[in-house]
Amino acid sequence: MTNLKAVIPVAGLGMHMLPATKAIPKEMLPIVDKPMIQYIVDEIVAAGIKEILLVTHASKNAVENHFDTSYELESLLEQRVKRQLLAEVQSICPPGVIIMNVRQGEPLGLGHSILCARPAIGDNPFVVVLPDVVIDDASADPLRYNLAAMIARFNETGRSQVLAKRMPGDLSEYSVIQTKEPLDREGKVSRIVEFIEKPDQPQTLDSDIMAVGRYVLSADIWPELERTQPGAWGRIQLTDAIAELAKKQSVDAMLMTGDSYDCGKKMGYMQAFVKYGLRNLKEGAKFRKGIEKLLSE
């Protein structure tokens, strides 16, 4: 079994969520009572990973601070006997989990962001989790499915894994995957035969499958990333490096189990907020009544 480290690229500027993200990192936008990045870290930890590397930017100090210990806050909560809140704050970074930071000096793309993590990862396999795609943990147990299942399959086969989902409609803003066999049920795996970042003419691909922002990558991806030239949007794309790797060895796509929300865009963020709000143990019932009242007006 391989002990993998996870990379979370958080250096992006959150353009789709402006003006909210002008001064607040998109990863710190709340989904009810936790910032988006917390759901991502919780998923990674549930999959068994203990070392997490945040690739950050000078404007992302709030993300780094979120996972740091706030002695003043913890002391205040203890003095006021706010035990539940204190426990929640202390669980932000679980015991035994190490969260490190490295800076991406220039916005040169996701592939470049991953390369910035190489000194900390070394020439080893690793996991990449994009911070703006939240997988609903009530729709799929994170201890068993999706990232956890990808890691298990990687440990079994040694092949790189990409999580995928069906997305009928316009795929021009996404990473589109074509597989050898149809991904016709949750959890099914098939070899990737084509992988394109934000295709100009997605209708020319016989596929409605897109990447969901979860990758388990063998060490063979490093030379491909080093050779990758700027692609879509003038950026070094991880997708392009994986596509080259898939020409040389088997790279698997796994169809996601459950639901996900693209919280880097307004519609996905609103959907996630409502979904998590409705099942919030403390305020969910009131929230539901409030929404029902608004819809009836």
Swiss-Prot record:
GO terms for biological process: lipopolysaccharide biosynthetic process; UDP-alpha-D-glucose metabolic process. It comes from the Bacteria. Keywords: Lipopolysaccharide biosynthesis, Nucleotidyltransferase, Transferase. The keyword Nucleotidyltransferase applies. One of its GO terms (molecular function) is UTP:glucose-1-phosphate uridylyltransferase activity. PANTHER family: UTP--GLUCOSE-1-PHOSPHATE URIDYLYLTRANSFERASE. Its EC number is 2.7.7.9. The gene is galF. It catalyses: alpha-D-glucose 1-phosphate + UTP + H(+) = UDP-alpha-D-glucose + diphosphate. This is UTP--glucose-1-phosphate uridylyltransferase. Belongs to the UDPGP type 2 family. SUPFAM superfamilies: Nucleotide-diphospho-sugar transferases. Pathway: Carbohydrate metabolism; nucleotide-sugar metabolism; Bacterial outer membrane biogenesis; lipopolysaccharide biosynthesis.
